[in-house]
Amino acid sequence: MKPGEYILKNEEITCNEGRRTIKITAVNTGDRPVQVGSHYHFYEVNSAIQFNREETIGMHLDIPAGTAVRFEPGDSKEVSLVDYAGERFVYGFNNKIDGKLDTRRN
């Protein structure tokens, strides 16, 4: 192995296997672009993004880590969301949950 060298496997990488996913349509009704990162709690995104928020509690974008989806003003996009894993506590973002997720879902 050489310093800095990557040795990669040829097999497919499966992400989020066994986790609940949904698809929703979200619309940017604002006058500025909004970018949402891969691990941002989608329920708490900018209020200019319109969608059924309640169904997205405890979910984030189902995209590779470190990437994002950008909504230009007026954009309507279908996005795939996936449940958070682990102990399912969420703090910060827009401080709408600040606690255990599973007590909030319908």
From Swiss-Prot:
<keyword id="KW-0963">Cytoplasm</keyword>
<protein>
    <recommendedName>
        <fullName>Urease subunit beta</fullName>
        <ecNumber>3.5.1.5</ecNumber>
    </recommendedName>
</protein>
<dbReference type="GO" id="GO:0043419">
    <property type="term" value="P:urea catabolic process"/>
</dbReference>
<comment type="similarity">
    <text>Belongs to the urease beta subunit family.</text>
</comment>
<dbReference type="GO" id="GO:0035550">
    <property type="term" value="C:urease complex"/>
</dbReference>
<keyword id="KW-0378">Hydrolase</keyword>
<comment type="subunit">
    <text>Heterotrimer of UreA (gamma), UreB (beta) and UreC (alpha) subunits. Three heterotrimers associate to form the active enzyme.</text>
</comment>
<dbReference type="InterPro" id="IPR050069">
    <property type="entry name" value="Urease_subunit"/>
</dbReference>
<dbReference type="InterPro" id="IPR036461">
    <property type="entry name" value="Urease_betasu_sf"/>
</dbReference>
<dbReference type="GO" id="GO:0009039">
    <property type="term" value="F:urease activity"/>
</dbReference>
<dbReference type="InterPro" id="IPR002019">
    <property type="entry name" value="Urease_beta-like"/>
</dbReference>
<comment type="pathway">
    <text>Nitrogen metabolism; urea degradation; CO(2) and NH(3) from urea (urease route): step 1/1.</text>
</comment>
<dbReference type="Pfam" id="PF00699">
    <property type="entry name" value="Urease_beta"/>
</dbReference>
